[in-house]
């Protein structure tokens, strides 16, 4: 099939509603971008605390069976800190418990057995998504 044929095939797919991108969970962003489309790269950037990690988590959560690879560049945190943030989001989403990075790493006090149980139970999820992440960090 030539590139012209592929283009027209995509146009036909769109007319039949099959080119809808993966939803981001942010309707206004989906309106402007068409969601995440195959073969189209999106650059998401923002200030610290603006929700970039949450957006990444939402995609990992909502599309676990999709073969989507995420490249994450960070100049402010290491890979371990990013994974800790994703772990925290998963635990909050799954169990309704927020465990801060300071608590997770026992910075101020020893991590409780209750929290440790949730962290251990979440390890399977973290292992299931790690192959979908390519992280370039500040180190």
Predicted regions and their residues:
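Cytosolic-facing regulatory segments adjacent to core modules
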Residues: 31, 69-139
